[in-house]
């Protein structure tokens, strides 16, 4: 018999954030590390393409704030989701693990939002 009131799961929301964070961490983050962490210190950029003033102006623009927010938050959700499931796979039972890991991710998301808004 089909249950007319199936139990809804919140897992798709967390899987969506995990997937978005994984894709961001695989595609966007390595490019930023290459540009800012390797090429910039070696002086491989023309002139002041990434001068402090230009980077600060970008970071204080709307699109820059959104980019910084996503650059921090999406990999954060991915990592904490991975840690939550790794603890389960290793049979290390964290009391209220879903609340601990996803709650920490939510708190850090709010902290990041406040930090990016006040930049």
From Swiss-Prot:
Named from the GO MF annotations, one term is: succinate dehydrogenase activity
Q: Where in the cell is it found?
A: Cell inner membrane
Q: Which GO terms describe its cellular component?
A: fumarate reductase complex; plasma membrane
Any GO BP annotation: fumarate metabolic process
**Which SUPFAM superfamilies does the record cross-reference, listed alphabetically?**
Fumarate reductase respiratory complex transmembrane subunits (SSF81343)
Q: How does it sit in the membrane?
A: Multi-pass membrane protein
Where this protein primarily resides, as one coarse class?
membrane
Annotated membrane-spanning segments are 25-45, 61-81, 99-119
Q: Which domain of life is it from?
A: Bacteria
Q: Entry's Gene3D superfamilies?
A: Fumarate reductase/succinate dehydrogenase, transmembrane subunit (1.20.1300.10)
Keywords for this protein = Cell inner membrane, Cell membrane, Membrane, Transmembrane, Transmembrane helix
Report if keyword Cell inner membrane is assigned.
yes
Could you say which protein family the record assigns here?
Answer: Belongs to the FrdD family.
Subunit relationships: Part of an enzyme complex containing four subunits: a flavoprotein (FrdA), an iron-sulfur protein (FrdB), and two hydrophobic anchor proteins (FrdC and FrdD).
**Function field:** Two distinct, membrane-bound, FAD-containing enzymes are responsible for the catalysis of fumarate and succinate interconversion; fumarate reductase is used in anaerobic growth, and succinate dehydrogenase is used in aerobic growth. Anchors the catalytic components of the fumarate reductase complex to the cell inner membrane, binds quinones.
Put simply, this protein is called Fumarate reductase subunit D
> Whose protein is this, by species?
Salmonella arizonae (strain ATCC BAA-731 / CDC346-86 / RSK2980)
């Amino acid at each position: 018999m089909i249950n007319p009131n199936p139990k809804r799961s919140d897992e798709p929301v967390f899987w969506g954030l995990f997937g978005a964070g994984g894709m961001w961490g695989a595609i966007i983050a390595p490019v930023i590390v290459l540009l800012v962490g390797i090429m910039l210190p070696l002086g491989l950029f023309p002139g002041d393409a990434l001068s402090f003033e230009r980077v600060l102006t970008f970071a204080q623009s709307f699109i820059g704030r959104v980019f910084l927010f996503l650059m921090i938050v999406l990999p954060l959700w991915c990592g904490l989701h991975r840690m939550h499931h790794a603890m389960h796979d290793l049979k290390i039972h964290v009391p209220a693990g879903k609340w601990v890991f996803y709650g920490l991710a939510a708190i850090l998301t709010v902290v990041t939002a406040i930090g990016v808004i006040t930049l």
